[in-house]
């Protein structure tokens, strides 16, 4: 639905909602400063047509690193800059550990699952998920072995093209999805499996829809716009279809479950469900299982595959960087064995390049919303319990106080004077604090092993001259996606 139509709908209903709102109790607390809101519409008129991120960055310049924006009728506190975000999410981690609502997802997730829950439910599910993923990551077939095998499958597929140009999106989706599938479902899929391809298409389409302007406007006025057509309905339809597949998979697992030999995340969860079946207050029930699997599958597929897509577009844009990475690969690994995770500490330049790709591309610029779990005093302001808080991760990843050239791609941001990898507190593509991304470790391992294996086996070429390659993302909302492109993988 067009922005102008959405705005008209909001305006025509705003007055009635305003009248109703006057009879509601007023919010207590002392919020950070921000633009003066209109009744019901909030700060809609201060929103940039380019999206929420652009709007928030402009408001940061005027109001500082902590400010309040009314997204429709509700106040949301914005946290900008490295120091501010760390002070809230790390130093006051418990107070800021609640999960805010993502309006386009809420009809499906409804506060369930390991990513979208809060309080004791979240703590219980996160402890279980971390332990389970760690156990399967360090067992007989470790995550590293799975990634290496998948990387080899990819190399064989790319060799079939014999240097012909291709769009790498499909293959990057397949390899990343297969890793999370092996952990959650206990199996990997052939790249031609119709069910697998359909699931990948649903995830890709949903991710793109969530980045649209329509979805961003929906976050402001979901209470009204949920009754009208829009991207939110397709998102719910897609997610429900994925949930149906997960539910079917859970039933197959239940029918073939061997308590002495759990195969994957689902088996382990089912065993825990059985153990706690007499506990009427347990969080280990079907709803939390399917939403947790949906969350892990969705979050563990699209963000990492999109990072890989951007990685090789950047390598085409800056071929001298790709050449330096390949030189380091040749020196440390050579051509006769697979890259391993142990190689990472011996390859500071490659590691710095991957860090810089994540920083520069900034794929989740706003991050998932938080919510304060109690009345919270922060920098002299009293933020009332249950107020939503947005950590603007982009403002840290592009923080000029921490990065010399924040808007340029420069691996030197992560190298010291001796060429060794250096840490940077502003590097938080996975967020930070207690709600840091559950799959951070797996994602980092995937990026290193896939990136190095591809560059070990192939040189890169583009049908377009480097100076004409566009790195500007298609969307700059809650998520970013790179432009579509063609690439030649030339066997080395």
Curated annotation (Swiss-Prot):
Cofactors required: heme
Q: Which residues carry this modification: Phosphoserine?
A: 129
**Organism of origin:** Mus musculus (Mouse)
UniProt keyword annotations, A-Z:
Endoplasmic reticulum, Heme, Iron, Membrane, Metal-binding, Microsome, Monooxygenase, Oxidoreductase, Phosphoprotein
Q: In which tissues is it expressed?
A: Expressed only in differentiated keratinocytes in skin.
Q: Which is one Pfam family of this protein? A: p450
- Which GO MF terms does the UniProt record name? heme binding; iron ion binding; oxidoreductase activity, acting on paired donors, with incorporation or reduction of molecular oxygen, reduced flavin or flavoprotein as one donor, and incorporation of one atom of oxygen
- Name of the protein this chain belongs to: Cytochrome P450 2B19
Family according to the record: Belongs to the cytochrome P450 family.
Q: Which InterPro entries match?
A: Cyt_P450 (IPR001128), Cyt_P450_CS (IPR017972), Cyt_P450_E_grp-I (IPR002401), Cyt_P450_E_grp-I_CYP2B-like (IPR008068), Cyt_P450_sf (IPR036396), Cytochrome_P450_fam2 (IPR050182)
Q: Supply the EC number(s).
A: 1.14.14.1
């Amino acid at each position: 639905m067009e922005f102008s139509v959405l705005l008209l709908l909001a305006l025509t209903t705003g007055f009635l909602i305003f009248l109703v709102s006057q009879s509601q109790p007023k919010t207590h607390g002392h919020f950070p400063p921000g633009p003066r809101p209109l009744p019901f519409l909030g700060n809609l008129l201060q929103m940039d047509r380019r999206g929420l991120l652009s709007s928030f960055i402009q408001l940061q310049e005027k109001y500082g690193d902590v400010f309040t924006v009314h997204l429709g009728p509700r106040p949301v506190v914005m946290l900008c800059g490295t120091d501010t975000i760390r002070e809230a999410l790390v130093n006051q981690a418990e107070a800021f550990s609640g999960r805010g609502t993502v309006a386009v997802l809420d009809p499906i997730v409804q506060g369930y699952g390991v990513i979208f829950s809060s309080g004791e439910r979240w703590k219980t599910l996160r402890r279980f998920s971390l332990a389970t993923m760690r156990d399967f990551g360090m067992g007989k077939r470790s995550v590293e072995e799975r990634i290496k095998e998948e990387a080899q499958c990819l190399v064989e597929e790319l060799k079939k093209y014999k240097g012909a140009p291709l769009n790498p999106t499909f293959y990057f989706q397949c390899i990343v999805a297969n890793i999370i599938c092996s952990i959650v479902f206990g199996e990997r899929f052939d790249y031609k499996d119709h069910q697998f391809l359909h699931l990948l298409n649903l995830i890709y389409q949903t991710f793109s829809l969530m980045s649209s302007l329509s979805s961003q406007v929906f976050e402001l006025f979901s209470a009204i716009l949920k009754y009208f057509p829009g991207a939110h309905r397709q998102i719910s339809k897609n997610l429900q279809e994925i949930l149906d597949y997960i539910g079917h998979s859970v039933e197959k697992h239940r029918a073939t479950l061997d308590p002495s030999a759990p195969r994957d995340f689902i088996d382990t969860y089912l065993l825990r469900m059985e153990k706690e079946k007499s506990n009427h207050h347990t969080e280990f029930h079907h709803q939390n299982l399917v939403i947790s699997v949906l969350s892990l599958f969705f979050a563990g597929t699209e963000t990492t595959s999109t990072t890989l897509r951007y990685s090789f577009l950047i390598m085409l844009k800056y071929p001298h960087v790709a050449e330096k990475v390949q030189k380091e690969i040749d020196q440390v690994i050579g051509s006769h064995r697979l890259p391993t995770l142990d190689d990472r500490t011996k390859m500071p330049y490659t590691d710095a390049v991957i860090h810089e790709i994540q920083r520069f591309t900034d794929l989740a610029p706003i991050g998932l919303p938080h919510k304060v779990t109690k009345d919270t005093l922060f920098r002299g302001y009293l933020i009332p319990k249950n107020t939503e808080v947005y950590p603007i991760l982009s403002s840290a990843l592009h923080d000029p106080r921490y990065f010399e050239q924040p808007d340029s791609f420069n691996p030197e941001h992560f190298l010291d004077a001796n060429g060794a990898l250096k840490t940077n507190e502003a590097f938080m593509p996975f967020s930070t604090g207690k709600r840091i991304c559950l799959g951070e470790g797996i994602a980092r391992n995937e990026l290193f092993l896939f990136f190095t294996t591809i560059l070990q086996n192939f040189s890169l070429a583009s049908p377009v001259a480097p100076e004409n390659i566009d790195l500007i993302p298609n969307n700059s909302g809650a998520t970013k996606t790179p432009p579509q492109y063609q690439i030649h993988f030339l066997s080395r």
